[in-house]
């Protein structure tokens, strides 16, 4: 083993792995197909300003001045759900890992696709009616 390999190995051991964060990241990746579907199905060219972002630790949909954002807070090992409208921000939910499942602390329920739909509907109520 070279000196560089030994140094990297020591740094890796020092940094360690956060198994809870790892599982949370894996669960967060389960949102990829949903945000990917939005990116794919929304028109490439539109009369309205919009963007759909699907990163490993941050996902959001923004239409004009309104945004729904889900991101991982790595310090707390939670998923934060926020609504942004103009310069205002409202925290909609904190999602934690409970028994290897995503759990909504505010709603007191297991996270489901229906709850994600509720977040989208609540955020874009002015558009959806």
Where is each model-derived feature located?
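Hydrophobic transmembrane signal anchors and adjacent membrane-proximal interface regions, especially
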Residues: 13, 40, 51-53, 63, ...
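Short linear motifs in intrinsically disordered/low-complexity regions
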Residues: 4-6, 58, 100-101
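Ampiphathic alpha-helical segments that act as solvent-exposed interaction surfaces
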Residues: 85-129
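Residue-identity detector for glycine
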Residues: 16, 36, 57, 65, ...
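Amphipathic, interaction-prone secondary-structure segments
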Residues: 39-89
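Contiguous, amphipathic alpha-helical segments that mediate oligomerization or scaffolding
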Residues: 2-52
């Amino acid at each position: 083993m070279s000196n560089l390999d030994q140094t990297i190995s020591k740094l890796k051991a020092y940094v360690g792995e956060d198994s809870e964060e790892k599982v949370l990241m894996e669960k967060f990746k389960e949102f990829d197909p949903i945000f990917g579907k939005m990116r794919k199905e929304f028109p490439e060219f539109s009369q309205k300003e919009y963007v759909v972002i699907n990163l490993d630790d941050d996902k959001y949909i923004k239409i004009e001045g309104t945004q729904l954002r889900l991101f991982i807070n790595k310090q707390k090992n939670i998923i934060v759900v926020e609504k942004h409208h103009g310069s205002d921000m409202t925290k909609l939910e904190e999602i934690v890992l409970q028994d290897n499942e995503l759990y909504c602390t505010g709603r007191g329920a297991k996270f489901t696709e229906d709850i994600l739909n509720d977040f989208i509907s609540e955020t874009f109520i002015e558009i959806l009616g």
